[in-house]
């Protein structure tokens, strides 16, 4: 369980974010947002590295630093644009309503895309890989003028991190 109780938590429409949100924020109203979904990996979906290591399409995708489109899936730039547009809309809505806290519980790739685009200090996509069951606390003091979010701290909500 998290150490605070938000009224609302925005989650993706994929089941695992709602499951995690119910554990961390059991009293919160969950609001599913389709635009927060993890990248569509197309024909790679549901397969692990070992299953794909000899797949030429997978090898080509990895060789291209995962920037090319997944077969029948999304290109990383399109995914990042979708995520950042959705996150910006949620932030704008929260600020317009005078809300002091916005909680988004999303997938790792979703977090990395938003952090790469908006976070200070600036880091590349893969450098924002957060901990399991964790994420980032951000300050939106310059959001309206600069669309920047300042890193306050990294959080992790696992049994190991609380010992």
Question: At which residue positions do the language-model features occur?
Answer:
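Short beta-strand scaffold positions
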Residues: 11-12, 81, 105-106
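Acidic, low-complexity terminal tails and accessory targeting/binding regions
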Residues: 39-50, 92-100, 115-163
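Short glycine/proline- and acidic residue-enriched helix-loop micro-motifs
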Residues: 59-78
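ANL superfamily AMP-binding
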Residues: 1-5, 86-88, 92
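Glycine-rich phosphate-binding loops at beta-strand->alpha-helix junctions
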Residues: 110-114
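Amphipathic, non-transmembrane alpha-helical scaffold segments
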Residues: 14, 76, 80-84
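Phosphate-coordination/substrate-recognition cap region in phosphate-metabolizing enzymes
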Residues: 1-57
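Generic beta-sheet signal
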Residues: 7, 98-108
């Amino acid at each position: 369980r998290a150490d605070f109780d938000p009224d609302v938590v925005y989650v993706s429409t994929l089941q695992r974010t709602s499951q995690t949100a119910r554990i961390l924020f059991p009293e919160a109203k969950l609001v599913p947002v389709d635009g927060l979904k993890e990248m569509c990996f197309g024909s790679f979906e549901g397969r692990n590295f070992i299953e794909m290591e000899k797949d030429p399409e997978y090898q080509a995708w990895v060789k291209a630093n995962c920037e090319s489109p997944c077969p029948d899936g999304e290109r990383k730039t399109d995914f990042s644009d979708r995520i950042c547009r959705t996150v910006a809309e949620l932030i704008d809505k929260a600020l317009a309503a005078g809300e002091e806290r916005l909680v988004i519980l999303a997938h790792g790739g979703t977090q990395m895309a938003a952090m790469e685009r908006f976070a200070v200090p600036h880091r590349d996509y893969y450098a924002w890989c957060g901990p399991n069951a964790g994420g980032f606390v951000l300050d939106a003091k310059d959001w309206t003028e600069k669309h920047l979010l300042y890193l306050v701290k990294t959080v992790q909500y696992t049994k190991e991190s609380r010992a």
